[in-house]
Structure formats: structure tokens, C-alpha cells
């Protein structure tokens, strides 16, 4: 029997997974997966759980926003043998999922994981221990996504980020930047 680790953030995107969780789990079970389910409790929880349990499964599926996805990827990058990754978008904006054509309806995304064709995607590393697949950002407004409370995102969706961004305008300042790659350095 194939084994799956399903990690989800119950607070992401207006807590929408709560009404669909049983249907998602049923899809995976009927597809022949032995499931281990983990509900995230704190920041970096997905990363820690995936790093610890990911080596024991064939597939890791995460559901949440871009932050949950990035934590899951960071956990997977610590593994010697990497399982497949599935993603069920459940965040406020789901930019990454939209860019890949992953269905916004959670049960359809679960079916894609079960019946779809795996494909490779590039990852990057930021600050030596955090990985990403979609965006690594720095400078003005990058703190907005971290400063925006989950309650506000659940209430307002994407507009919550806009409000937090407007609040940040008064505190804009220049940043020192240094980028190193292939023996080259760019610094300003």
C-alpha cells in the first residue's frame, strides 16, 4: 500500500479546508493510500514534521497557503530520498497554485494528486535553511505577508495584504543588498 503524509494548516484561507477535509481524505483513501495526517500548530511545524516523517512515505501532500507550501518544501529538502509532493491550495490568494493551473476547488486538486502526472519544478534556497518554489522576495513590502494577521486574511482575503502594505508606506527605507552566485557578487 502506498503511504501518504498529509499536512494541512487549518487556519489558512478562511479555514476553508474544514468543510472539505473528509472528502479530501476519502479521495486519498479510495486511491489506495495509507494516510498519516498532521494538523499544523505553529510556524515551521510543517517543515519539522515533513523532515521527520517524509522519509517514510511515497507522497507528501500539503494544504494551506504559500507559507505552508514553502515550509513543506523546506522539510522535504532535508531528506535524502525525496517523496513526491502534492499541493491542495487553501490560502488567501493561492498565487503559486494559479500559476501552475492547480484547481482552486480542493477536491479537484486532490484528484489531480491521485490521477495526475508528476513533473519536476525548481527550488531555491534562502538564508541557508528555507527553500521556495515560487517567490523569494526582499526589500519594500516583503514584511507585509508576515505582518498580516491570519484573522485579517480570513476576513478580508487578498485585501488584507493591501491594507497592511498601506500601513508600511511611512516606514520605507533603503536596504543593503548582497547577492552571491557562481563566484560572482553583486552588492549595493
Annotate each predicted stretch with a short phrase.
Residues 1-63:
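ATP/NTP phosphate-donor binding region
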Residues 9, 66, 144:
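A residue-level signal for conserved active-site and pocket-lining positions in enzyme catalytic cores
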Residues 12, 69, 92:
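Short, glycine/acidic-enriched loop or turn micro-motifs at the edges of active sites
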Residues 18-20, 73-76, 98-100:
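Short amphipathic alpha-helical segments
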Residues 24, 46, 72, 96-97, ...:
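Hydrophobic packing residues within well-ordered alpha-helices of enzyme cores
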Residues 31, 78-188:
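Catalytic core of DAGKc-family lipid kinases
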Residues 41-44, 64-67, 91, 139:
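Short beta->alpha linker loops
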Residues 68-80:
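Short Gly/Thr/Asp-enriched flexible loops that form oxyanion-binding sites at enzyme active sites
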